[in-house]
């Protein structure tokens, strides 16, 4: 399984990338806007830090606008993946871009049908949203399981990026269900390394060692 960082904070990306567990980065207009910096500059800086797929999202609403923007974004770096919203216009754009060899990440996936349509259109990645589905009482884990089953059954080359990840339990569950990737907010990475028994155990080891060395 691969881990992507779901942030555009360059300092956080640098720090977490040193752990050796980051395979890529995802961003969206909301995440970029929080940084208050030029979109292209931020994406290029991220590409210089992480050697893996870096998702950058279009803001156009028509297929023509998305394609034009995507072609420009794709030129920023070889690792850039263009994020496209799951709409009919988005599917048209994905189809065109996939034929041009531009990698796409179709986002805002909430149903199996949406995921299947994106796969058929040639999406490199699809991003089903875990937390947001749970917010409305929908079984997000079943969606991940169903999408993976379809990919394996029909040999689609699309990979699942489990998004809207909010807890360590989310990461653990989607890993067991076969999501190819989990995209994780930077604060959650720290939580994934921690447990009270680990902290207490290390404290005991150090105390015992200090006593032994006296």
UniProtKB/Swiss-Prot annotation:
Catalytic center residues: 83
Keyword Cell membrane: no
Gene3D superfamilies associated with the record: Aldolase class I
Key words of the record: Cytoplasm, Pentose shunt, Schiff base, Transferase
GO cellular component: cytoplasm
Pathway entry: Carbohydrate degradation; pentose phosphate pathway; D-glyceraldehyde 3-phosphate and beta-D-fructose 6-phosphate from D-ribose 5-phosphate and D-xylulose 5-phosphate (non-oxidative stage): step 2/3
Pfam family, one: TAL_FSA
This protein's record includes keyword Transferase: yes
Coiled coil: none
Entry-linked SUPFAM superfamilies: Aldolase
Enzyme Commission number: 2.2.1.2
Subcellular location: Cytoplasm
Function, in words: Transaldolase is important for the balance of metabolites in the pentose-phosphate pathway.
Protein family per UniProt: Belongs to the transaldolase family. Type 3B subfamily.
Record protein name field: Probable transaldolase
Species assigned in the record: Streptococcus pyogenes serotype M2 (strain MGAS10270)
Lineage of producing organism: Bacteria, Bacillati, Bacillota, Bacilli, Lactobacillales
Originating gene: tal
């Amino acid at each position: 399984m691969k881990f992507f960082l779901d942030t555009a904070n360059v300092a956080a990306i640098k720090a977490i990338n040193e752990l050796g567990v980051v395979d890529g980065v995802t961003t969206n207009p909301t995440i970029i806007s929080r940084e208050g910096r030029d979109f292209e500059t931020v994406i290029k800086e991220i590409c210089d830090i992480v050697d893996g797929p870096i998702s950058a999202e279009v803001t156009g609403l028509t297929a023509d606008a998305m394609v034009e923007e995507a072609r420009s974004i794709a030129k920023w770096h070889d690792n850039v993946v263009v994020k496209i919203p799951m709409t009919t216009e988005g599917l048209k754009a994905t189809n065109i871009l996939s034929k041009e060899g531009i990698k796409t990440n179709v986002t805002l996936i909430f149903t199996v049908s949406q995921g299947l349509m994106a796969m058929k259109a040639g999406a490199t990645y699809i991003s089903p949203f875990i937390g947001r589905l749970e917010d409305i009482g929908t079984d997000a884990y079943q969606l991940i399981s169903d999408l993976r089953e379809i990919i394996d059954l029909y040999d689609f080359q699309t990979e699942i990026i489990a998004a809207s990840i909010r807890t360590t339990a989310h990461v653990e569950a989607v890993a067991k269900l076969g999501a190819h990737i989990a995209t994780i907010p930077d604060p959650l990475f720290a939580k994934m390394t921690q447990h009270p028994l680990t902290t207490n155990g290390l404290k005991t080891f150090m105390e015992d060692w200090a006593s032994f060395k006296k």
